[in-house]
A protein has these predicted regions:
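SAM cofactor-binding core of SAM-dependent methyltransferases
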Residues: 1-10
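Class I S-adenosyl-L-methionine
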Residues: 13-33, 40-224
Length: 224
């Protein structure tokens, strides 16, 4: 196996190309898969109204030299849902709502022009047995003639068992919470938390604790 720690934008690809060529000779029936979990901070809605880093938002553009160098059979992309909204920004570094998705559409078309079919899904981790409800974008590019297949869910929010489905109920996070571990008090820290962090903690207390003990226990004992 090869491991690189260099910046993907400037990585010298010769060792990778040589490794892929040798692998194709040794395992002629194997598929070469290029997986890219592109940095998502500057796409995510968690960024709020803050300016975006334009360079971070163009990391997907750097995939093309990998595609052209190793000619993968599959390219698989994982990112936040907002990746599909990738588009130009104004001078203040904020996305232009009128051109939302423009760069994403162009990028998908450019990858497809290298001989790939494409499909995507928005998948929820909870639907596959994770202890968190987290949606993510998954895109698959496949060389023409190769199938594009997404996994079938194993769980759903309320559970479903009938002639057509056998889906377990979402797993409640309480199963993996250690409520005996209270952590370290924010009031005894040597370094004071930032104002933004304190604001987030306060918002969480209002949302999840302010209703009182009974309301909190109801939340804890449910999957909502």
């Amino acid at each position: 196996a090869l491991h690189f720690t260099e910046d993907i934008r400037t990585l010298e690809l010769s060792p990778l190309v040589e490794h892929v060529l040798k692998t194709r000779v040794l395992y002629p029936d194997a598929f070469v898969v290029l997986w890219a979990s592109l940095e998502c901070t500057n796409f995510s809605k968690a960024k709020g109204g803050q300016p975006r880093d334009a360079d971070s938002r163009t990391l997907a553009e750097h995939l093309f030299r990998y595609i052209e160098s190793i000619n993968p059979d599959y390219i698989q992309i994982e990112n936040v849902e907002e990746f599909m909204s990738w588009g130009p920004m104004n001078e203040e570094g904020k996305p232009l709502s009128t051109r939302k998705g423009e760069d994403y559409t162009r990028w998908v078309s450019k990858v497809k022009s290298h001989g790939y079919n494409f499909d995507y899904r928005i998948l929820n981790a909870a639907d596959y047995g994770a202890y968190t409800s987290r949606k993510r974008f998954f895109g698959i590019f496949a060389k023409n003639g190769l199938p594009v297949i997404f996994p079938e869910p194993t769980h759903c929010k309320e559970g479903k068992r009938d002639l057509f489905d056998d889906l377990a109920r979402w797993k409640p996070v309480k199963d993996v919470l250690d409520l005996e571990d209270e952590g370290t008090s924010i009031f005894t820290r040597k370094k004071t938390l930032s104002e933004k962090t304190l604001e987030r903690i306060y918002a969480g207390l209002i949302k999840f604790v302010a209703g009182g003990k009974e309301k909190w226990l109801l939340k804890y004992n449910s999957i909502n």
